[in-house]
Structure formats: C-alpha cells, structure tokens
C-alpha cells in the first residue's frame, strides 16, 4: 500500500505494519514534518489500529536508523517553531509509550540523540552488527529532551544510563545488547527479516491478550508488586472471557491452530 506521508514509508505485511523513517539524504533525522507525521500516524493507531497487530520501525537506507533532530532545520528556526518541535517530541514519546500495538525496532544503522531515545521508548529492538548508538545532547549544549533520562535507566540501569548520557559517547550494537537497550544483534543482511519474523509471531497471537499483557508490562517498572499484580488481574479478566480465549480452547481440543479475531 502507498504511504500517505512524505517522511514515512509505510507497508503492510499481513497484520504487521512496516514503517521506515524516510529521509535518507538527511540521515533520517527528525524535522518538523516528520515529527508531525509520526504523531499523526501514532494517533491514528491509537484511535483505530484496524488489522494492525504489530509494528516494525526502521530507517530508510542501510547506514542510519535515525540521526536525531534535524540540526540544519533547527539552526534557522524561529522561537515559535522551536517550541512546536519540543511539544511534538514530547507527544511523540508519550504516544509511543501509550501505543496499543507493540512496536519493534530494526535498528539498521546509527541511532543518535532522539533516534536512540525512540529505540529506548519502544517495546523492544533488534540491531544490525553495524548499528551504533549515542546520546550526544550534552556535547551540543543541552540535556536530553525526548525521554532518555527516564527510558534509558529502565532499560539499562541507572549507572549505565549515567555513563551513556553524561559522556555522550558512541557505543556499539554489541554494547547496546549487553546493556539491555537492544534484545539481539544480527547480520545486517538478515536484520529486517528476523525482526519481521518476530513481529509476525506477535501478530499471530490473540490481539486482545497481547494488548492487555502489554498494558500490564508497561507499568511493571513503576508500580510496586501489589499494585502491578492487581493491574495484571484486571487486564487478565476480559481476556479470560473473550471469544479468542474460547477459540484457543476449542482449537486445542480439535488439535489445530487457533484463528484469533481480537475479541
């Protein structure tokens, strides 16, 4: 299917949506147009995900996943546009966190600044062997503003997060894996297909159950055990009485794969 956006390339693969950040000539950096379009795309998913059960986010080309904010655009921005950009980035990170559909990243190259923060904000990520990561904000005279001080400690631990953010150093895909920022490092030639394969597995599961499990998991790092467990039980209840649950029971008895419909 053709994409309605200028800075995003969107394709469908069954119940999986593949989204490419599509500004390769500018390092897939996030300008105002891309920030607007990412927010619009996520809002549409929040309102009605339709047949989409899992998302894979990657960068166009084979060198850069996302180079962060568009510094060339920023240099000529009026104050009102700067404020608009900040508001859009805040909304973007919140919408990623609140998205009802799991989002996976296929990090196909450098993920710098906001690009690295997007990787930290989504559900989980695979990276190519050539991927690199950096949070260079302190080297550019600012502190992080797209969630890094909150998402990186949750993924990597507070001491590692301080090292990454306060030095602004570049680190490798293997280090990102060892520190918890990405789940797996794979050859560049197989990255997209391996990530899509995981997305297809998620998409084949009961959609309501996946959504409810994701909601419960998303509060696990913030809530105490008792609060989190109560939330899990509340999330579990509608799945236990769903038609998909009955379909799974029937399919098991009939020795076949279940066909889930999301209800």
Model-derived regions, located:
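Hydrophobic alpha-helical membrane-association signature
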Residues: 34-38, 85-88, 118, 191, ...
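Phosphate-coordinating loops and pocket residues in cytosolic domains that bind phosphorylated ligands
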Residues: 29-32, 67, 76, 166, ...
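Short, conserved glycine- and acidic-residue-centered signature motifs
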Residues: 31-34, 85, 112, 145
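C-terminal alpha-helix plus adjacent terminal tail
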Residues: 1-17, 45-50, 62, 168-174, ...
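Structured loop/turn residues at beta-strand edges in well-structured enzyme cores
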Residues: 3, 14, 50-52, 69, ...
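Glycine- (often His-adjacent) and acidic-residue-rich active-site loop
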Residues: 51, 59-95, 111, 141, ...
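Crotonase-fold acyl-CoA enzyme core
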Residues: 94-210, 237-242, 247-250, 254-256
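Conserved CoA-thioester-binding segment of acyl-CoA-metabolizing enzymes
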Residues: 1-58, 94
């Amino acid at each position: 299917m053709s994409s309605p956006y200028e800075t995003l390339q969107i394709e469908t693969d069954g119940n999986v949506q593949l989204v490419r950040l599509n500004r390769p000539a500018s390092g897939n950096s996030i300008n105002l147009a891309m920030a607007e379009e990412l927010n619009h795309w996520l809002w549409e998913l929040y309102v009605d995900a339709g047949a989409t059960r899992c998302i894979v986010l990657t960068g166009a080309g084979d060198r850069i996943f996302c180079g962060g904010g568009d510094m060339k655009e920023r240099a000529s921005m009026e104050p009102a546009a700067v404020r608009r950009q900040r508001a859009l980035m805040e909304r973007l990170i919140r919408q990623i966190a609140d998205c009802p559909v799991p989002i996976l990243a296929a990090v196909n190259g450098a993920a710098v600044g906001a690009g690295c923060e997007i990787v930290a904000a989504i559900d989980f990520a695979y990276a190519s062997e050539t991927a690199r990561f950096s949070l260079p904000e302190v080297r550019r005279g600012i502190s992080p503003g797209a969630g890094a001080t909150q998402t990186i400690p949750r993924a990597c631990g507070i001491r590692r997060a301080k090292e990454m953010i306060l030095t602004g150093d570049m680190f490798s895909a293997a280090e990102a894996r060892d520190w918890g920022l990405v789940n797996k490092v794979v050859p560049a030639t197989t990255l997209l297909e391996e990530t899509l394969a995981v997305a297809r597995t998620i998409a084949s599961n009961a959609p309501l159950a996946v959504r409810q499990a994701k909601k419960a998991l998303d509060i696990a790092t913030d809530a105490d055990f008792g609060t989190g467990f109560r939330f899990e039980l509340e999330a579990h209840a509608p799945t236990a009485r769903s038609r998909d649950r009955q379909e799974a029971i029937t399919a098991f008895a009939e020795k076949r794969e279940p066909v889930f419909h999301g209800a």
